[in-house]
């Protein structure tokens, strides 16, 4: 499965807690949202064609912040790529969370520069909603 089966319940819990959710993708975000089954949970979906730039440029992250109506410093950007998601979000003034995969997940090795490294979405929920 592209998205871990706990991702949707976790996003529901985040929405129930009053958090906004957005998709920022270098690919058509509607397609990702529809494939993953999370489009209905998103407040904003932005792709590179709308932002005019690819991650890790700060421009797409700035557009995400503006469309969500939330200051960059108040956003936790969740991704799966150190280079594109973590570094891009950090440069834009956001906090970053990155899912651990492969040997990082197996051995609990933190993602460099990420404010939060997590093994699964339930763990992310526990950290964010504690």
Residue ranges and their predicted role:
Residues 8, 12-13, 17-130:
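Asp-based, Mg2+/Mn2+-dependent phosphohydrolase catalytic module
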Residues 1-5:
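Metal-dependent phosphoesterase signature
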